[in-house]
Each structure stands twice: as C-alpha cells, then as structure tokens.
Amino acid sequence: EQQCTPGQTKKEDCNNCTSGD
C-alpha cells in the first residue's frame, strides 16, 4: 500500500495516490 503525501488523496479503488486538486 502506497503512502499519500500531504495534498494527495487516496484512490481506494486502485490503491494508489493522486494529486488532491
């Protein structure tokens, strides 16, 4: 499971992080 940095959101459906725009 990848860690999300501040400002990112967890995409639970694919278990990764994306920019929290």
Swiss-Prot record:
Gene Ontology CC annotation, any one: extracellular region
Lineage: superkingdom: Eukaryota
Annotated compartments: Secreted
Region (Disordered): 1-21
Known role: Probable serine protease inhibitor.
Family label: Belongs to the protease inhibitor I19 family.
UniProt-recorded name of the protein: Serine protease inhibitor 1
Organism this protein belongs to: Melanoplus sanguinipes
